[in-house]
Amino acid sequence: MSREEGNNGRRPGGKMRRSRKKVCAFCVDKAEFIDYKDINKLRKYVTERGKILPRRISGTCAKHQRELTSSIKRARNIALLPFTTE
């Protein structure tokens, strides 16, 4: 049961494509804070099932991801955003 040598963890038969690093949309806009009442902006960072998108998918920086998470949770608590969708 030996593995092929020289593969270096890559998928067989394909060329590795390096993806471009995502830029935080809030840093680009120079947003001072993320408003929990801005539902249209918050909906971009929530899946259709109601889960908050992680940083690696949304492309936000750590500071704005923390702020975004608390804004989404605050909007959920006052029923601006749903907890889940069915």
Swiss-Prot record:
PROSITE patterns from the UniProt entry: RIBOSOMAL_S18 (PS00057)
UniProt keyword terms in alphabetical order: Ribonucleoprotein, Ribosomal protein, RNA-binding, rRNA-binding
GO BP terms, alphabetized: translation
Protein name: Small ribosomal subunit protein bS18
Gene3D superfamilies attached to this UniProt entry: Ribosomal protein S18
PANTHER family: 30S RIBOSOMAL PROTEIN S18 (PTHR13479), SMALL RIBOSOMAL SUBUNIT PROTEIN BS18M (PTHR13479:SF40)
One CC-aspect GO term: cytosolic small ribosomal subunit
Function noted in UniProt: Binds as a heterodimer with protein bS6 to the central domain of the 16S rRNA, where it helps stabilize the platform of the 30S subunit.
One term of GO molecular function: small ribosomal subunit rRNA binding
Organism classification: Bacteria, Bacillati, Bacillota, Clostridia, Eubacteriales
Region (Disordered): 1-20
HAMAP family according to UniProt: Ribosomal_bS18 (MF_00270)
Similarity-based family: Belongs to the bacterial ribosomal protein bS18 family.
